[in-house]
């Protein structure tokens, strides 16, 4: 039986050395956990992680995390702490350079993230901050027929005319506070209209509380003149800018 339904492959050597003290009702753990030469690929994630080296030191009610991994030829690191003394808390820092992201057939990209994550699982609070640089990417025009994605068990279907915020509040969603800056480098290309269109720009992405959609501020534009084929004609595209000042899916 698969470890998880959407896990394509998983490998590595996991070891633990430590001791247990305290009482049956209040055990205390101390020890070291190591993952050597780990790897994982999941159909739900656009990354295949390889060469995962992870070390965690568990000291009673707290654990530290130090790890490194590869995605393509890019290198990433993951550090942080997990504390479960009172209200459990997870604090992580993700850094990387030229990590390979691939969501076939729509996008292949290299990303350089610097992200901090703070999670309070019992309170359902999540804070996400940082920046993601995209020095290189190839974005393809989606096909006319979009592949079907199965609905997960926690999805709530919102019918037309229903109050989305009220439904979200009744479902007790996570309180998310996200602030991310995304910058496009000079090798980001959109492939469509029988042309390769170079893009450039920056977006500030944010989400607050029970908001139903991520918001964006910034602009993405064509960085140089190109020739495209659209509406049955060959056209010169001199200038095009998509400006964002609201819901991410609704640029102007």
Task: Tell me the role of every PLM-derived stretch.
Residues 6-17, 36-43, 47-252:
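Strand-loop-strand
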Residues 2-4:
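Short acidic, glycine/proline-rich loop/turn micro-motifs
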Residues 27-33, 128:
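Short flexible loop/turn segments that cap and initiate beta-strands
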């Amino acid at each position: 039986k698969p470890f998880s339904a959407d896990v394509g492959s998983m490998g590595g050597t996991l070891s633990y050395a430590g001791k247990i003290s305290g009482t049956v009702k209040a055990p205390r753990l101390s020890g070291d956990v190591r993952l050597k030469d780990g790897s994982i690929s999941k159909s739900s994630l656009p990354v295949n992680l390889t060469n995962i080296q992870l070390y965690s030191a568990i000291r009673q009610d707290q654990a530290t995390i130090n790890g490194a991994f590869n995605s393509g030829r890019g290198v990433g690191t993951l550090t942080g702490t997990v504390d479960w003394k009172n209200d459990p808390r997870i604090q992580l820092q993700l850094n990387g350079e030229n990590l390979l992201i691939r969501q076939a057939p729509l996008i292949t990209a290299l990303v350089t993230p610097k992200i901090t994550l703070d999670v309070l699982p019992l309170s359902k609070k999540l804070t996400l901050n940082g920046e993601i640089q995209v020095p290189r990417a190839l974005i393809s025009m989606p096909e006319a027929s979009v592949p079907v994605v199965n609905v997960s068990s926690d999805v709530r279907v919102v019918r037309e005319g229903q109050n989305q915020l009220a439904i979200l509040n009744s479902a007790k969603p996570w309180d998310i506070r996200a602030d991310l800056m995304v910058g496009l480098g000079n090798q980001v290309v959109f492939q469509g209209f029988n042309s390769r269109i170079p893009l450039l720009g920056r977006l500030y992405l944010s989400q607050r509380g029970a908001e139903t959609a991520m918001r964006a501020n910034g602009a993405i534009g064509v960085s140089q003149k190109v020739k495209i084929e659209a509406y049955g004609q060959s056209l010169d595209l001199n200038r095009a800018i998509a400006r964002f000042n609201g819901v991410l899916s609704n640029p102007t």
